[in-house]
Amino acid sequence: QQDYGTGWMDF
């Protein structure tokens, strides 16, 4: 799942 808040992947 892409974390669009930080740009990193949300694990």
From Swiss-Prot:
Residues found modified as Pyrrolidone carboxylic acid: Q1
Official protein name in the record: Caerulein-3.1/3.1Y4
Residue numbers bearing the Sulfotyrosine modification: Y4
Post-translational modification Phenylalanine amide, affected residues: F11
Organism: Ranoidea citropa
Tissue-wise expression: Expressed by the skin dorsal glands.
The protein's role, per its UniProt record: Hypotensive neuropeptide.
Taxon lineage: Eukaryota, Metazoa, Chordata, Craniata, Vertebrata
Modifications made to the protein after synthesis: Isoform 3.1Y4 differs from isoform 3.1 in not being sulfated.
Domain of life: Eukaryota
Family, as annotated: Belongs to the gastrin/cholecystokinin family.
Location(s), subcellular: Secreted
Gene Ontology process terms (BP): defense response; regulation of blood pressure
Main location: secreted
